């Protein structure tokens, strides 16, 4: 009696909302919450905004191209398989290992950033404990089923999105003088000193590298395509929504920070070379608004 062996199939449980939040949650993190202050301090509000817009345009073309490939050929092997199939085996091999190395370094960076963030609230606890705890959480989430992973990512990414929306609302109120905050110069910061473009072309290029790091994670749609429901339908929808939402979040946040905090603010300059979460532009702005507890 012969046995027929069925090849293992991935369970396609990820919908458009999961893909949206996986990409948004992967790209919105320390690049915005911590590094955005350094971009304004180094290149001024105009330079930082221009750098994010330029990188955003580049990401748009990258994402639309990836979306076409993932829609035509959804695969569980991540997007480096497209390099193997459509270019050459060595190209796909190098792309795959570079991508692995990229995220291995990023995860380590994020675990270190967790120490600095948690130290703001729990200064007496060793940072190693927080890194170990969050590493266990990351491992646990990745060990879940596809549906469980998708729902977990949706929830955690939603928290990030809500935090940014609250930040944007408070920032708009401060710019419009609905929330009166002493010492906030608003649009005068765009013409102060060397502003809006500080440091010239070299500063713009340097900040563009930080902006590129910040957008990392948008490509997650290509990684998750092999486990998405009806990829021919969900991938194009997710690609269109993800790019504009992420670009909107970054551009609006950079504009608000550059408008409300001067590029030569001593605290912002310290944030450019400090590991103290208290110097995050988000924390500084909340303190100016009188909501230090929200930081």
Predicted regions and their residues:
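TM-loop-TM module centered on a large, flexible mid-protein loop between adjacent transmembrane helices
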Residues: 81, 88, 120, 238-295
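Membrane-interface "cap" regions at the ends of multi-pass membrane proteins
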Residues: 1-37, 41-46, 59-64, 76, ...
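Select transmembrane alpha-helical segments in multipass membrane proteins
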Residues: 13-23, 88-101, 134, 197-209, ...
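Juxtamembrane helix-boundary/capping and inter-helix hinge elements in multi-pass membrane proteins
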Residues: 43-45, 72-77, 85-91, 226-234, ...
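Juxtamembrane interface elements at the cytosolic ends of transmembrane helices
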Residues: 36, 66, 211-235
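Membrane-interface loop-to-helix entry segments
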Residues: 115, 128-187, 215-216, 239-247
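Hydrophobic transmembrane alpha-helices that form the core helical bundles
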Residues: 38, 50-51, 59-143, 148, ...
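Junctions where cytoplasmic loops transition into the N-terminal start of transmembrane alpha-helices
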Residues: 47, 156-159, 222-258
């Amino acid at each position: 009696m012969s046995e027929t062996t069925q090849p293992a199939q991935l369970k396609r449980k990820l919908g458009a909302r999961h893909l949206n939040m996986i990409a948004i949650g992967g790209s919105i993190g320390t690049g915005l919450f911590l590094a955005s202050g350094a971009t304004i301090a180094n290149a001024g509000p105009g330079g930082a905004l221009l750098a994010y817009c330029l990188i955003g345009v580049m990401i748009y073309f990258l994402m639309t191209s990836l979306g076409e490939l993932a829609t035509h050929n959804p695969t569980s092997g991540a997007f480096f398989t497209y390099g193997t199939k459509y270019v050459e085996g060595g190209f796909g091999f190098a792309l795959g290992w570079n991508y692995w190395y990229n995220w291995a370094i990023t995860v380590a960076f994020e675990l270190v950033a967790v120490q600095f963030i948690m130290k703001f609230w729990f200064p007496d606890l060793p940072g190693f404990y927080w890194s170990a705890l969050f590493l266990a959480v990351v491992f646990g989430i990745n060990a879940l089923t596809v549906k469980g992973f998708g729902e977990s990512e949706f929830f955690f990414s939603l928290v990030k999105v809500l935090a940014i929306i609250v930040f944007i609302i408070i920032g708009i109120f401060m710019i419009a003088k609905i929330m009166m905050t002493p010492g906030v110069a608003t649009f005068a910061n765009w013409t102060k000193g060397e502003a809006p473009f500080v440091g010239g072309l070299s500063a713009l290029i340097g900040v563009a590298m930080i902006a590129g790091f910040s957008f990392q994670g948008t490509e997650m749609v290509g990684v998750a395509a092999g486990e998405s429901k009806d990829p021919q339908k969900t991938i194009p929808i997710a690609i269109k929504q993800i790019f504009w939402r992420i670009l909107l979040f970054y551009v609006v946040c950079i504009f608000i920070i550059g408008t409300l905090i001067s590029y030569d603010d001593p605290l912002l300059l310290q944030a450019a070379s400090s590991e103290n979460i208290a110097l995050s532009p988000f924390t500084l702005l909340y303190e100016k608004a009188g909501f230090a507890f929200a930081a």
